[in-house]
Amino acid sequence: SMLGISAYLGSKDINYDALENSKIFYIEGYMVTSDENFGAVKSVLSSIKNKETIKALSLSDAGIVQGFKEKFNEIESYGIDMIFCNDDEAIAFAEAENFGNAINFYKNKSYMTVITKGSEGSIIINKGKEIFSPAVSIEPIDTNGAGDMYAGSFMHAYLRRFELSKCAEFANYASSKIVQTFGPRLTPEGYLSLIHI
């Protein structure tokens, strides 16, 4: 991944007033790799006073999780509400020997964990229970952006108060659209077609 100018995002760049009205604060896991980014994340987490604001974390990459585990643990200690990850990232964060052990790790957590498994669909772990959602059967062209599309779509549905199974179903559908095109974004028409679902 190329972080570009975002690697220099620091606490001074944050609009804290806007954050007070935010429904979700979404933390991209790559932000642990930059001291400025990590400082900004901690500053925002410390400043959130609205108990309705959902704090969501993407684990981003298994190698990043392994290399910066202490920083991820520090973010977790602020009281995360949701974690998004793929199966490799889930195993890395849980420091588990296999996926089954990782599932048990997340069942004992207070936050919701949403795990994507590519063509095998996705799993939500919430309050000790598992909810499985099958993938949409398609022929992928390019998986770039699929995880971000999944997380964004899931959170969109969650804010609209969909049942968790429906959140996952919508996210699976949306991410199935992104992998059928080259690049990490849909056309404007593609996004509009999703909004009306």
Predicted regions and their residues:
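Conserved phosphate-binding/catalytic loop of the ribokinase/pfkB sugar-kinase fold
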Residues: 1-36
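Short gly/ser/thr-rich secondary-structure transition/capping motifs
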Residues: 4-11, 62-67, 95-96, 133
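Conserved beta-alpha-beta core of the PfkB/ribokinase-like small-molecule kinase fold
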Residues: 24-103, 120-122
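Active-site donor-binding loop signature of nucleotide-sugar glycosyltransferases
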Residues: 2, 85, 135
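Conserved phosphate-binding/catalytic region of the ribokinase-like
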Residues: 47, 69-70, 95-194
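Alpha-helix N-cap/helix-start capping motif
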Residues: 3, 87-88, 148
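A short, aliphatic-rich alpha-helical micro-motif
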Residues: 18-20, 76-77, 107
